């Protein structure tokens, strides 16, 4: 699609629910009629297994092959190897082979923009590309940030996340300065929120105090729930596994919020083009 938006789901801290957010935001956008490609950019392959491809080591084509193809200037079909999930999202899968790509990228020409080069060949088929980043800053994560139009940051509602957020802001700032000047932060998603405590409110207050003047805190927040943890092993989204749950309703609202933000930006771009 001409106005395809690429979003990196990113946080350098682990355990913040990046993969779950990628799955459920992606399916939520698909439920709104959007064409969505999910990209697994983590050698652990959690996004791939969460969507039902548990034996990801047996996959014949993964993101590693696509990145290698760009480096080798291979002209095979860019759509080959993209998997289609029953909930109307596509997946570029990953497995442990992606770990070796870190070393290959170090010596590659234009090493930070290999993923961007690949996605440029397929993104016109989609409204959204969502990249599930690994919880560390390596060459693959830099490629994800270089390829992205924007970043969504899931933050677990825990005591004072400001230190980790500051490190992430510095990383994004460097990527913007040296690699991708148009990269922006769409917002912070409060995730795994335990509504039985005041911790979520304290976390939100701390985030607003430290970052609220420059970064949006999404109105939607995702509650902690056993069902949300269970669904990761079921190969489907929360919408399919427990459609009437509070978590499904929360992700539905979040997807609508992200989609509405996208429409606002499209209108601004249209106005600027006149």
Model-based region annotation:
Residues 1-274:
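P-loop NTP-binding core
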